Amino acid sequence: MEQERLPVTIKTKAIPAPKLSIYYPQLLLSNKTYQQKINKRIYQKVYHLFSKVNQQGYYQPGITEMIGDYEVKNNQCGIVSLTLSNFATMPTLAHPVTFLDSITTNTQTGIIYQLNELFKPNSQYRQRINELIAAQIKERDIQLLGTFKGIGPNQKYYIADKTLIIYFDMYDISPGYVGFPMFPIPSFHFQDMIHDTSPLGILLT
């Protein structure tokens, strides 16, 4: 159906509080059950980013300035992939702190995907992705804190068109000045491993 291929309507909502400018997306879907499920998960991730700032002692009400935002990376064929960010600073901080998360979902089914769910069972996707990331690290001369040990089972990612972007939190594998190390990997590198009904599989059809 043509309707399924149209972009999903996304509404921006805000969390009102002094010195906080936290904006987050809410999807407007015809299926309200899926809408509620996906939007609840988005809000949970937004709150988790805020909690990380608070847990690390960077949040002081009325003093900490915090900006939360989002970017839509993919919105086609019913597949929505977006990133959520939280930036916090206050006078006693030498450097601002930033946290990043993401979510990828099929709005036609309400399924929210972990990285492993993009691929066929028992495929060696992690090995192939690790090899591709290692090659990019060398080619781009990305500074590391130690030896690259590969992606985790719940590795953060998002999808931009037909490209998979694997990323790491600040200080996970690189010094802070590198920011969030991101590794774009075109789908053709592992097309044989992609599950047909996953977001990447749908975008490739």
Task: Give a label for each model feature.
Residues 1-205:
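Compositionally biased intrinsically disordered regions enriched in Thr/Gly
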